[in-house]
């Protein structure tokens, strides 16, 4: 998958490049940064010649005669199922996506560096999963984790367990190498398929990713070295 960045702030652009390059290297994803620029017309020209699905990180306010949302609208004409993510400091401009009818994957706000990194990675994960779903391999099972204004798609095989959050109506998905907080309930998750089992009031585990169980201490250990607890009556059921 080719990734395009259009950001007119050089420092912000370089920061995004670093985040994405590190992610690709560490996770060994089949992705590459095809272009990082402040020129929207360079991105549009690349989109016109795309044979595959692209992933576009677009600053909304650009120092040119075209803004990021208009750019996204033009990209849609050439890459109708591409992943478009808007990066901005101005939340009040998000309404323009409805004006231009751009189906954006996410809106990422620049103000919080930690959140910026997390959301970029979430978008890359979701873009990768979408690409797999659109490829010939339709056997990959995924779940949509709703986070409010956006969703993250993750594969069943990447899930270690789900945990109740301290925040109302929210859960935490423990994946192979990260955690995602989302809206949901454990009862529904335990019914996804036979691999998911509610071992405790606060946990639903993925049986396929269990490494070992300490029946005496009622602790479930997973392949990624995390653990959770099981109730007495559910230890033997697993």
From Swiss-Prot:
Main localisation: cytoplasm
GO cellular component, one term: cytoplasm
Cellular location(s): Cytoplasm
InterPro entries (UniProt xref): CheY-like_superfamily, LytR-like, LytTR_DNA-bd_dom, Sig_transdc_resp-reg_receiver
4-aspartylphosphate PTM sites in chain numbering: 59
Keywords annotated in UniProt: Activator, Cytoplasm, DNA-binding, Phosphoprotein, Transcription, Transcription regulation, Two-component regulatory system
One MF annotation (Gene Ontology) recorded for this entry: phosphorelay response regulator activity
Record domain HTH LytTR-type: where: 143-238
Pfam families for this protein: LytTR, Response_reg
SUPFAM superfamilies: CheY-like
SMART domains: LytTR, REC
Domain Response regulatory: 2-125
Reported function: Required for high-level post-exponential phase expression of a series of secreted proteins.
NCBIfam families: quorum_RR_AgrA
Protein name (record): Accessory gene regulator A
């Amino acid at each position: 998958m080719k990734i395009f960045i259009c950001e007119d702030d050089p420092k912000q652009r370089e920061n995004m490049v670093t985040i994405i390059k590190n992610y690709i290297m560490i996770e060994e994803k089949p992705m590459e940064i095809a272009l990082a620029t402040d020129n929207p017309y360079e991105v549009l020209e690349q989109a016109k010649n795309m044979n595959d699905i692209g992933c576009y990180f677009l600053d909304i306010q650009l120092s040119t005669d075209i803004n990021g949302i208009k750019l996204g609208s033009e990209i849609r004409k050439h890459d109708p199922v591409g992943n478009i993510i808007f990066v901005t400091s101005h939340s009040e401009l998000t309404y323009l996506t409805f004006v231009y009818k751009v189906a954006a994957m996410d809106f990422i706000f620049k103000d919080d560096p930690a959140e910026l990194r997390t959301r970029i990675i979430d978008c890359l994960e979701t873009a990768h999963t979408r690409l797999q779903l659109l490829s010939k391999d339709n056997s990959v099972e995924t779940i949509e984790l709703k986070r409010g204004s956006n969703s993250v798609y993750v594969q069943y095989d990447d899930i270690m367990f789900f945990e109740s959050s301290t925040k109302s109506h929210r859960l935490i998905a423990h994946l192979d190498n990260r955690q995602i907080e989302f809206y949901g309930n454990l009862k529904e998750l335990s019914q996804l398929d036979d691999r998911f089992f509610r071992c405790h009031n606060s946990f639903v585990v993925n049986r396929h990713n269990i490494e070992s169980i300490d029946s005496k201490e009622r602790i479930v250990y997973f392949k990624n070295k995390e653990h959770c607890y099981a109730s007495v009556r559910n230890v033997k059921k697993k």
